[in-house]
Amino acid sequence: TLPSGVFYNHTTSIIGNGVALNIPVLMKEVKSITDRNVPMPKILVSDRAQMVMPYHILFDQYEEERLGGKSFGSTKSGIAPFYSDKYAKIGFQVSELFDEDLLKEKVVRVCEQKNVILEHLYHKPAINPDELLETLHEYREMIAPFVCDVSAYLDEAIKAGKNILLEGQLGTLKDPDHGIYPMVTSSSTLAAYGAIGAGI
């Protein structure tokens, strides 16, 4: 999750809107470097980044189990369910953590949808909306110090003539449009997508 720039004290490391943000993993990675005496990096997280939810990881595992030998070799990190929710418009953006009324309503609504699938397709335990809301409150506390409007920040950086390095992962053959479909990832891996994923 962490950009490679975290090891340089003159950089600002940005988690853009295009990232599938697993907040506990991000915090664990930050702790892993600061525990080794690396200075705390300056990190900004886009308020438009969407979060990998605990149930995304479960759904990923359940689907792999269901498919058995016909699975697509998922990393079981929740990526496919994450993007499914993002494009179905039931994902959670970081900004939504800071609107309590919206958050409560959405948690209940999304749990209703997910629990139908859990019961009838996977035959697994239901998600408790109260427990999920509490988890999101914990996420909010973790991420709050880093959240900002990254697009506005980068716009000012461009005007000031700052250097911006975009960082991605994987390669062309993992791109969902130009890769070896269906053995691909769930978001574009091409350089052209970098500006979109960063908010430039």
Regions found by a protein language model. Give the residues of each.
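Non-transmembrane, aqueous-exposed alpha-helical and coiled segments at domain scale
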Residues: 1-200
